[in-house]
């Protein structure tokens, strides 16, 4: 796990040590949530998981995200907290469905959500990869809890 400043050093160091072909996976900490094309170019090919809200992928609440950007919130972690609030609000109306149908999924701003056997919400993040200094969402593969394809 590395924050953006440290993560920008990983790829150049791997290239220096002739290990640039190694795949690099990271946590969501690697992406600040702000587009920094020039700074993040050194993170090209790093694969990481993050919430759809941070990756700016198309979601049902696109209007809310656009309105939140008008608030000029300087700290991008507050944007992530806002996404959590949006999901909390939207989940209220579908909790019964998630409880009755264990393989039902809710496509939220924070990821794909479902209720497990213990009635706890679990979240699956979206995968992305830096290309040209920009995070690009990767195609998602849906799996069940037991690892089998649905």
Task: Show the residue positions of the predicted features.
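Segments of small-molecule ligand-sensing domains
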Residues: 65-137
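Residue-level signal for alpha-helical context at structural boundaries
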Residues: 28, 109-111, 145
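Short linear motifs at secondary-structure transitions and domain/linker junctions
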Residues: 1-2, 21-25, 100-106
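Short, low-complexity, Pro/Ser/Thr/Gly-rich segments in the mature regions of secreted, periplasmic
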Residues: 134-150
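Residues in flexible loops and secondary-structure boundaries
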Residues: 54-57, 121, 135, 143
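Extracellular/periplasmic periplasmic-binding protein-like sensory domains
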Residues: 11-86
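Hydrophobic alpha-helical
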Residues: 1-14
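Active-site proximal loops enriched in glycine and acidic residues that flank catalytic Cys/His/Asp
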Residues: 2-3, 26-29, 50, 129-131, ...
């Amino acid at each position: 796990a590395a924050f953006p400043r440290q993560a920008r050093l990983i790829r150049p160091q791997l290239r220096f040590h002739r290990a640039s072909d190694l795949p690099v996976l990271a946590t969501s900490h690697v992406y600040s949530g702000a587009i920094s094309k020039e700074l993040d170019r050194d993170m090209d090919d790093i694969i990481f998981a993050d919430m759809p809200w941070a990756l700016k992928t198309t979601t049902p609440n696109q209007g809310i995200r656009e309105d939140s950007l008008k608030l000029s919130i300087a700290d991008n972690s507050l944007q992530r907290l806002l996404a959590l609030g949006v999901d909390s609000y939207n989940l209220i109306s579908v909790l019964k469905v998630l409880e009755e149908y264990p393989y039902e999924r809710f496509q939220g701003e924070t990821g794909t959500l479902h209720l497990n056997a213990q009635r706890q919400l679990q979240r699956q993040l979206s995968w992305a990869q830096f290309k040209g200094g920009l995070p690009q969402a990767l195609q998602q593969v849906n799996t069940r809890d037991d690892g089998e394809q649905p």
